Amino acid sequence: MNNTLLLIILNFVGKIFSFVREMIFSFTYGTGDITDAFNTSTTAATLIFSVITYALSKTYIPTYNEVVKNGDEKSGDHFTNRLLDFMLFLTTLMMILGLVFAPFIVKLFAAGYSGEKLKIASLFMRAVILTIYPNVYAAIFSAYLQIKGDFLTPALPLVIMNILLGLTIMVSKGNVVIMAVGIFLAYFLQYVMFPRATKKAGFRREKISFGLDPNVKKLIILSLPTTFTMAAVYISTIVDQSFASIVAPNGGVSIVNYALKILRIVSSTFIIPFQITAYPIIGKLVANGDIKGMKDLTGQSLVKIMTLFIPSIIGLMVLSEPIITFVYYRGEFTYQDMIATSQVLFYYSLYLIGPALADLLYLSFFSHQNTRVPTIIAFIQLGINIILDFVLSKAYGLVGLALATTFSQFAAVLMALIAYYKYFGKLNYPYILKNIGKIILAGGVMGAFAKFFFAIRPSNLWLLVTIALAGLIYVGLVYILKVDEFDQIIAAFKKKKKKLE
């Protein structure tokens, strides 16, 4: 729990810097062409990276554990070296293709782009594509360091990147070349801490060899379905962005991205830390054949996530307009932009329940080296999302895209729960539902208070007061209602506080 708490704090700090960066961006560029180009290009390049890095992060840990179990830690390091060699070869090919075909890739993500807007987006994308080496390096060694118990180093890149991007936006003043150079430096230098950390963990680089190691070959075969899983998720994102660029050609992509960036603060702060710390433990439980322990940990992690996550969703929905006003409404970001973004944020908020549940359930499948089930679910979800995008965007515009994503994600959760029951048996549903019921009750009271209290004196300062008081009310209610996992969260905070003292 202490590692989870540390990750929550670090992710929150990173997202504060992300918030500041977005405030600077919205003030400087609003929802204009440069903002659209930046959002589309960085999203496109990042999603391409993530298809690979996600597959590596989900298949490296179980493969490494198996190699060490059959040999020793030296064997695990040898396997890691051979994997890094193979990925250097693969990413070189990807980088060349990305640099050559950048305009075509941008058009896939935003069919409505043309002329100068397409040129700017292509320039920005090439800047990010050049950083593919450190991205893949970090994907492998983030998992390696987590196995070794270092959860701090993999959490630092977000802070470094957002500081550098914020500085870039401030000094660029509309100069797209300065923006491109700054984007490259931000994405490249965010991983500056990794070489020292891996050396400290005991890793030593071996001489480069491009022979295909049997364990690397096994990981590649294992990761193919996982790659398709992530590809399906990102094809969905491509479709959403393309529809956004058509439904609202002037600023539609930026409006959707501004809303999603706020949601990602909640996701990366409250979901990802629990998954990062739970995954190596689940992997070890599976390796030891402890299926009951795996299911118990999954249920406990789910309740812990929901304890922090449900009130965040309720707060985002109730205070969507004042939150968008506080973060973005200044400079080139207009009143119409604020209204449109707050509406999209409201309907996207419920979507986050999907990744919180589905991704946690998938960890058990990945630990069993079963990547087929998550892949099938992801592609069914993709089909549902595309159909709903087409239907709902015609009727409701950008809000329709948010609804389509939300409904398709709920379908994925239902399929994941059915598959989990089929392969591993029941989770402790009475325990889970009892606690989630209490959390929803406490969150509902908190949301009602926040809505009416903010209405007394609407302002940015009053918003902060409202959030603080609503948070205290929620904590008090959860404590009174005796949500099971809440005691562990409080104990971890107290333990961390004593260490700091």
Stretches found by the model and what they are:
Residues 152, 160-192, 372, 380-418, ...:
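Membrane-interface helix-loop junctions in multi-pass transport and translocation proteins
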Residues 195-233, 292, 422-440, 491:
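Interhelical loop/hinge segments that connect adjacent transmembrane helices in multipass membrane
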Residues 113-138, 333-361:
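Alpha-helical transmembrane segments of multi-pass membrane proteins
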Residues 54-70, 271-302, 362:
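Helix-loop junctions and terminal segments of transmembrane helices
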Residues 84-108, 299-331, 339-356, 386-387, ...:
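Alpha-helical transmembrane segments of multi-pass membrane transport and lipid-handling proteins
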Residues 452-501:
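Membrane-proximal transmembrane or re-entrant/amphipathic helices at the cytosolic face
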Residues 133-156, 350-380, 391, 395:
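Membrane-interface junctions at transmembrane-helix termini in multi-pass inner-membrane proteins
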Residues 2-26, 186, 190, 194-198, ...:
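Transmembrane helical elements of multi-pass membrane transporters/channels
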